[in-house]
Regions:
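Short, small-residue-biased leader/transition segments that mark boundaries at the very start
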Residues: 1-7
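Basic, Lys/Arg- and aromatic-enriched nucleic-acid-binding interface segment
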Residues: 13, 24-54, 165-166
Length: 206
């Protein structure tokens, strides 16, 4: 087996993990952000907050630097996966949390990456996934597979739930934000397609 086969297996593994990750209920996600900060785990609190409030992929969050998000109303990224430009607005609550985390983390400067390990290097995606599994156990989260993708899905589900009266419009917006090629992909990504299929059984009665 050559390197090509190994690479294909890694890609398939990542693709599979992205479709099987679950999402947090919004209230539980917000409680987790607060609990992590209370326990002085400001880096992971910031990670969860950014993931849930922006819907960015983990690779794009890890590439962020303080100067992009500190005291900013919005910031722009070039998505690593797609190469497309995306502008993200930071609401007031998230701005405050970013400032609080910055004060407690005390990075070497605003040019520094926002998520740096004790070794002085940016966290890897694999390490973040390990940390999130530890967080799930410690805080007894009501979620199956908790990984980096869970934060992005939590964002998507909350946007969808908050716009239930115009759900199709919400899906179109999410499709564009996620850079999906169709609404059906977005529905499948958020687990909505599976829910629709399962709800079919509830229509039956004696």
């Amino acid at each position: 087996r050559g390197l090509g086969d190994v690479y294909k297996r890694q890609v398939m593994s990542l693709k599979y993990s992205s479709t099987t990750a679950d999402y947090l209920q919004w209230s539980e996600a917000m409680n987790l952000i607060r609990k992590l900060a209370k326990d002085e785990n400001y880096k992971i609190s910031l990670l969860v907050a950014l993931g849930c409030f922006t819907g960015l992929r983990i690779s794009d969050i890890l590439a962020l630097r303080w100067k992009q998000i500190l005291n900013a109303e919005e910031f722009t990224v070039i998505e690593i996966k797609t190469g497309k430009q995306r502008t993200v607005r930071i609401n007031m609550q998230l701005q405050k949390h970013i400032c609080d985390c910055y004060k407690h983390i005390s990075p070497i400067g605003i040019d520094a990456p926002i998520l740096v390990s004790r070794k002085g290097t940016v966290y890897s995606i694999q390490r973040i996934n390990v940390i999130l599994k530890e967080v799930k156990r410690k805080y007894r989260l009501h979620i199956g597979n908790f990984s980096c993708h869970s934060l992005r899905k939590t964002f998507g589900r909350q946007v969808y739930n908050m716009n239930s009266e115009s759900s199709e419009l919400a899906l179109v917006k999410l499709m564009e934000l996620f850079n999906h090629s169709s609404v059906s992909i977005t529905k499948r990504y958020l687990g909505l397609r599976q829910e629709e299929l399962l709800n079919t059984y509830d229509c039956l009665s004696f």
